[in-house]
Amino acid sequence: MISIIMPVKNESLTLFKSLNHLQRLRDLNICEIILVDGGSTDNTIKIASNLVDHILITKSGRAHQQNIGASIAKGDILLFLHADTVITKEQIVSLKSIIEKNVWGFFKIIFDNRKIRYKILAYLINFRSKVYNYGTGDQVIYINRKIFNKIRGFPPLEIMEDIKICSILKQISQPSIRDSYVITSARRWEKYGFFKTILKMRILRFFYHLGVESKKLARYYE
């Protein structure tokens, strides 16, 4: 079984699109879906109630939420899915065969906004992932559960938990980068400005690698 773990907070506008097409996999017992809510004040939980197998409520924080979800997961594969990213049934099923060869990996991405700037951005993200062998949460990171437990899950960071766990996993094996694309939302770039958001991300990465405390980085990110 594959356990899909989704950390959320106020995602009522995206949940149905992300989860409705996966219901057949639940019916066939191919996957379970665990939603971990970090304090939503909208209709997130109400909408999710018929789309997931488990709803957990805890404090906000993506690393913490994902670890809480993983703690009750039954699957051999843990797949961490952001609420604004769409993955197909076929992509999920394909993991059953490759997980025996690679203990972790992620997908390539495209954006739901098809403007040329987003095509270029997606290309650069995918190229970076190939060169440096790490993915971000939007790329749907998946991990063999035994390995996840061995490394004690996501590190307790407020932000950059995806980058950190990839650096830990690379010490065990190189990732399997799937040659197929998940679709992720461009909403942050659209809301805060395309170039401004890219600059902000670069600044965050720079100070993260300098060792700045994740709580300070998270405040800047928000």
Where are these regions (language model features)?
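Acidic helix N-cap motif at the loop->helix transition within catalytic regions
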Residues: 13-17, 42-50, 90
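Conserved donor nucleotide-binding strand/loop of the catalytic core
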Residues: 31, 45-72
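A conserved acidic beta->alpha catalytic loop
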Residues: 37-45, 85
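Hydrophobic helical membrane-anchoring modules
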Residues: 167-222
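Short, well-formed alpha-helical segments that are part of the catalytic scaffolds
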Residues: 10-25
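Short beta-strand/loop segment that forms part of the nucleotide-sugar
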Residues: 6, 30-39, 56
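Conserved donor NDP-sugar-binding/catalytic core segment of glycosyltransferases
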Residues: 90-117
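Short aromatic/hydrophobic "clamp" motif used to bind/position activated sugar donors
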Residues: 78
